[in-house]
Amino acid sequence: MPKPSPLSLLCSLSLLCAPLAAAELQPKQLAGPPDEFAQMRAPDPAESAILSKSALLQVELAPAGQSARWQGSLPVENGHLRFMVLSGDQAWEAAVAAPQLAGARTAAVATPLQAQRTLLGSAEHGTSGMRYAVDSARNGAWALTLQSSSPVAQRGYVLMEGDTRTQLASYLRTRQQQVGQSLTLNALLTGTIDEASLRVIDPQGGVRSMPMADDGKHDDGAAGDGVYGGTFQPTSEGTWIAQVVVHGHDQAGQPFVRTSEHVVPVVDTSLRLLGNALGARAAAGTRLTIALPVAARGNAPSHYRVFGQVWGTDAKGKDIPVAWIGGMLTPQQGQLPLSLDERWIARAGARAPFTLRSLRIEDPDHYIPLVQAATLPLQVPALRRASISRASTAIDESMRMGPRPTALASAMAMAQPQAAGSQLVLVHGYCSNGVWPQAQFTNASTFLDAKQNRSNDQFAQRTAQFASQWSSFSTVAHSQGGMAALHLYTYYWSGLDNATGGRVMQSVGTPYQGTNLSGVLAAVGSWFGVGCGTNSDMTYDGAKAWLADIPADARAKVNYYTTSFAKTNWYTNDYCNAASDLVLNDPEDGTVEQVNAQLPGGVNRGHTTGQCHTTGMRDPAQYLDANRNAVMNANAAR
C-alpha cells in the first residue's frame, strides 16, 4: 500500500497549509456558442418542483394532568403505516389504533407497532427519532396518540410516508427572493385537493399559516383548474421555510395528507441597471469589454453571477445569435465588466445593430435574480483584423474562458508531471469531515473544512485556496464537494485548468439536481436546530438554478458515480436510511435519489447497489469502496 508523503499528511489536516501569499482567485470570462442557449436558460419554476409522497406534520403536546398529550389521525392509503416521531430531546410514547369497520360496535383497540430508533439526516447534520410501522394496515384514518410524562407544553413533528402513486408537486412561481417582494407557491397533484394551506417559518422561528386557493386570484391559473396558490411576503433577510400542506382524496377515494418543504433564502439586496443601452470597447488581444453600469443598495455581495446573450444582424437584416457570455463579476467603479472575444462575432458573420438579451445578474450564493433585462441595445466597435483572420479556427480555451492568467501558465511551465507540482485533492461534502481513505490514493491530499455550511461558491473558493499550493490538481469529491469542484472549474482559474493525463473531476453521491431531504431537515431544524444549518444549493430549485449557468464544456469534465441500497427481494421494503426512506423515492442512497444525482452533460461512470451515502446507514458508505477508489485514483489527472 503506498504511503502518503509527509507534505500530504500535513496538508490534509487543515486549510492552514495553503500559502499565505496565495493570489486572489481570478474569475474566468465565460462564453459559449448559440447552440447552448437553451441549456443556459433560467429553469422554468415548474421544472424545479418538489415531488412529495410524504407529510411532515407539526404536533403540539398539551398538558393533561400529570402528562402531556396530542391526538390526531394518520391516513393510510396503501396498506402500510410508516411514520417517524421527531421530538428533539423530549421522550414521547406513541400508540395507534386502526380505523373501525362500518357498523362495528367495539371500541378501537391499540395496534402493536414495530419501532426502531433512527436518524433523519447524517450524524453531523441530522436529528434522531423513533420510526414506527404497521406493515399490514387497514386503509383509512388511523388514530395516533403521543404522550409525554412531563406535564408541560411540547412540540415536534410526525413524518409520515404516503402512497407513491399520489405525489404533491409544488414550486415557487419566481425566484425574486428579496425583502418585501411577494412570493407565491403553487401546488397540484393527481387526485382531489380538499384543503390546502401555506405554513411559513421566518428566520427567527416564528410560524404563521394562511389558506391556499384555486380561485384564479392567487397566481394559480384559472379558477377550478386544480392548481392552488398561496402568497407570503418576507420581511427580513435570512432563510425562510415555506411548507405546503394538502389534505384530499386520491383517485381511489382514500384520504391522504401531503406536505412539501421549500427552503427560501431571502436577501436584503437590490441592484439597478443604470441606463438602457450598452457599449463595448476594445481590450487587449481580441477581447471586448462590455461595462454594465449598476447601483446596489442593501447588503450587496462582493461579486455577482452574470449571464447574457449577444445577438447581431446578418447581411439581410435578420437577427442572428452570436454567443452567450457571463461569469462571476466583481464591480469596478460601479460597473460589471462583461467580456466577449471578437472572434465569436466574426464566426457568426454578424454586424450591427447588436443587442444583449436575456440578461441575468444574480447573487453568487443563492442565484437570486437581482436584475433581468429582455433586450438592451449594444454598440460594438469595428472588428480588428486579427479577430477576422482567426475567425475560421476552432473554438479555443481563450474564446470560452478568456485569457489564461500569466501566473497559472508560468506555474504549469515550471512544474514536472507527477512531481511536487501536481496533486489529487480529496474533497468531502456538506457539513462533513474528511471521509476519503487517503491511503487508497497516490499523490493525494485531503481538503478539510470540517462540519461547515458553505454555498457552492464559498466551498469552491476554499477548495481553491487549499489547492493553490500545487501548480496542477484534480479532484475526487463526495456529495456537495462534487458541486464545489465543478463550480470552481467553471468560474475561476485554478490548478484544475492545468491538470493533464486523465479525469479532471470525479465525484460520488453528488446531488447535482438537489435532494428533497434538504427542505425536510430545514423545517425540522427550525424548531430543534440541526447540524450545520440550511443549505439552499442542495434543494431542488437551488441546485437547478445553480446548474443553469454551468456550461457544457465544464460538465463534460466531470466523471460521476451513483449508488443505492441493496435489494433483497421484491416484497421487502429496503432502504439505506429508515428515516429518509419516508421522503425519498427509490432508488436512493439515503440522501440523494439516483435520478437527481445525474449531471446532464457529465460522464456517468455507473451505478452501484449495496452502498449508501455515508457511514451509519444500512449498507457500507459509498466512499469506502476500495475497488472504485482504485479506479478513480488510476484515472485521475494530476
Predicted regions and their residues:
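Lipid deacylating catalytic domains
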Residues: A22, G402-R638
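Flexible, membrane-associating and regulatory peripheral segments of lipid-active enzymes
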Residues: A23, G88-Q90, L120, V179-Q181, ...
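Surface-exposed beta-strand/loop patches in noncatalytic accessory domains
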Residues: K53-A62, D89-S128
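Beta-sandwich interaction modules
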Residues: A68-P75, P112-A141, S149-G162
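A short beta-turn/strand-edge loop motif at beta-sheet boundaries
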Residues: D89-A95, R175-V179, L188-S197, A295-V306
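Aromatic sugar-binding surface patches on proteins
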Residues: Q116-Y132, K217-F232, T330-I345
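Short, aromatic- and glycine-rich surface loops/edge beta-strands on solvent-exposed regions
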Residues: Y132-V134, R138-P151, R155-Y157, S236-A252, ...
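Short, compositionally biased P/S/T/A/G/V-rich stretches that sit at domain boundaries
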Residues: L159-S182, V263-A284
